[in-house]
Amino acid sequence: MGLMTWDDATAWLIREQHGVLGRAQLAEAGLSEATVRWHLSRRWRILLPGVYQLDRGRPTRAQREIAGLLAAGPKAALRGLSAASWWGVTAADPGDWVHVMVPPPRRTRRVAWLDVARSTITDPAMVTRGPFQVCSPARAVLDAAQHSGSPDVAAAIGIEAVQRRLVTLDDLEEELCRRNQRWSA
C-alpha cells in the first residue's frame, strides 16, 4: 500500500488538524476500513476510538486537543483547564487530560485522557480558530478555577487572566450571572 497520496482538500485538512483525522474524515477521503487497519499496523497511531494520528510520533498537546474534539463530536469545545491553557493562562495546567464540553443530548464520559462534560449553559462568545472550538476566556477561567483542585491555583488562574487582560472582572461577573440564571425562575 505504500505512501499515501492525498487530494488537495484532504492534504489541507491534515495540515490544519496537525496530522489527526477521524474515521469519518478518512472514509470521506476514500479510505476503506482495510486500508485504515493496514496503516494503523505500520505507520499510524490510534489516539482515541475512531481518531487517528497519521504518524507514530508522540502526540503534541494540539494533536491531543484536536483528537478530543473529534472524538467528542460536533459542537464539542475545549473547556476548563484545557481552554484556559489554550488561551495562554500558564497557571492552568491540564496535565495529561483534555477537557471538552458538549451540548445535550450528548453524555458526560471519560475515555483514556479525554474528559467530556455535558453543558446546558450557552456560551455566546465561543471561538473557532482552525480546528479548535474553544469556550470564551471568561468561561475558561471560571471553569478552570472551579476544577483546579486548590484555592491557590484557582486564585492564580484568575489573577493571571486579569493581569494579562484576557478577561476583565466584569467579564467574569457576567459569566457568573449567566451560570446563575440557569437556576432562576
Name each model-derived stretch:
Residues M1-A185:
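Short gly/ser-rich loop at a beta-strand->alpha-helix junction or flexible surface loop bordering the NTP-binding
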